[in-house]
Swiss-Prot record:
Interacts with FGFR1, FGFR2, FGFR3 and FGFR4. Affinity between fibroblast growth factors (FGFs) and their receptors is increased by KL and heparan sulfate glycosaminoglycans that function as coreceptors. This is Fibroblast growth factor 23. It is linked to Hypophosphatemic rickets, autosomal dominant: A disease characterized by isolated renal phosphate wasting, hypophosphatemia, and inappropriately normal 1,25-dihydroxyvitamin D3 (calcitriol) levels. Patients frequently present with bone pain, rickets, and tooth abscesses. CDD domains: beta-trefoil_FGF23 (cd23333). The lineage of its organism: Eukaryota, Metazoa, Chordata, Craniata, Vertebrata. It comes from Homo sapiens (Human). Residues 205-219 have a biased composition (Polar residues). Following secretion this protein is inactivated by cleavage into a N-terminal fragment and a C-terminal fragment. The processing is effected by proprotein convertases. O-glycosylated at Thr-171 and Thr-178 by GALNT3 and glycosylation of Thr-178 requires previous glycosylation at Thr171. Glycosylation is necessary for secretion; it blocks processing by proprotein convertases when the O-glycan is alpha 2,6-sialylated. Competition between proprotein convertase cleavage and block of cleavage by O-glycosylation determines the level of secreted active FGF23.
Length: 251
């Protein structure tokens, strides 16, 4: 009985000691803070410019002055000191080739898509490839990481919390709804695309043969109405070309 109580007291004392140690030595890494597990933007800056690392859908990696939906990242811890960085919108892993160029990939390769994270004395974070030893950088110059060195400015990052409304990450892509090409009423319900009917003379309604020259009528001697000055009796039933009224034909 006494031994059981003693074991309980020892367990309680150990738990209290562990809590006090954690409070005395908090982990200052932004990866393990309150923002861990949420959306993070990696921010880097110089005296002239500032950028947020973003991974596009085509795998291109660059920087944006402000937070964008493509600069929202998920940083997940793998082993001790190693992280995996993923673009939220592009759904691509941040990877590095043997020349130190960073890119986004849909396929995870432990050798190319894992980075070692270290916090510098100035509070900035650096990420370098354990395979190629190059630093993750938005600058053109690619440099390897050496302990105690001063890394280039565009390879030093600060983790910033996401300030973009979450609804921008859930907006569906517009899709074109296709209908049957035979259903004209659904395709153009307001008849906007249909051409309007035009009034054009139908040549067949006015194709009358000219009177024969053997006929003694005035129309026979002057079929075109040149001598008569084009004056014909319009009440005669429209026997001449001037009296022909073409019918409307819709085309």
């Amino acid at each position: 009985m006494l031994g059981a109580r003693l074991r309980l007291w020892v367990c309680a004392l150990c738990s209290v000691c562990s809590m006090s140690v954690l409070r005395a030595y908090p982990n200052a890494s932004p990866l393990l803070g309150s923002s861990w597990g949420g959306l993070i933007h990696l921010y880097t800056a110089t005296a002239r410019n500032s950028y947020h690392l973003q991974i596009h859908k085509n795998g291109h990696v660059d920087g944006a002055p402000h937070q964008t939906i493509y600069s929202a990242l998920m940083i997940r811890s793998e082993d001790a000191g190693f992280v995996v960085i993923t673009g939220v919108m592009s759904r691509r892993y941040l990877c590095m080739d043997f020349r130190g160029n960073i890119f986004g990939s849909h396929y995870f390769d432990p050798e190319n898509c894992r980075f070692q994270h270290q916090t510098l004395e100035n509070g900035y974070d650096v990420y370098h490839s354990p395979q190629y030893h190059f630093l993750v950088s938005l600058g053109r110059a690619k440099r390897a990481f050496l302990p105690g060195m001063n890394p280039p400015p565009y390879s030093q990052f600060l983790s910033r919390r996401n300030e973009i409304p979450l609804i921008h990450f859930n907006t569906p892509i517009p899709r074109r709804h296709t209908r049957s090409a035979e259903d004209d009423s659904e395709r153009d319900p307001l008849n906007v695309l249909k051409p309007r009917a035009r009034m054009t003379p139908a040549p067949a309604s006015c194709s009358q043969e000219l009177p024969s020259a053997e006929d003694n009528s005035p129309m026979a001697s002057d079929p075109l109405g040149v001598v008569r000055g084009g004056r014909v009796n319009t009440h005669a039933g429209g026997t001449g070309p001037e009296g022909c009224r073409p019918f409307a034909k819709f085309i």
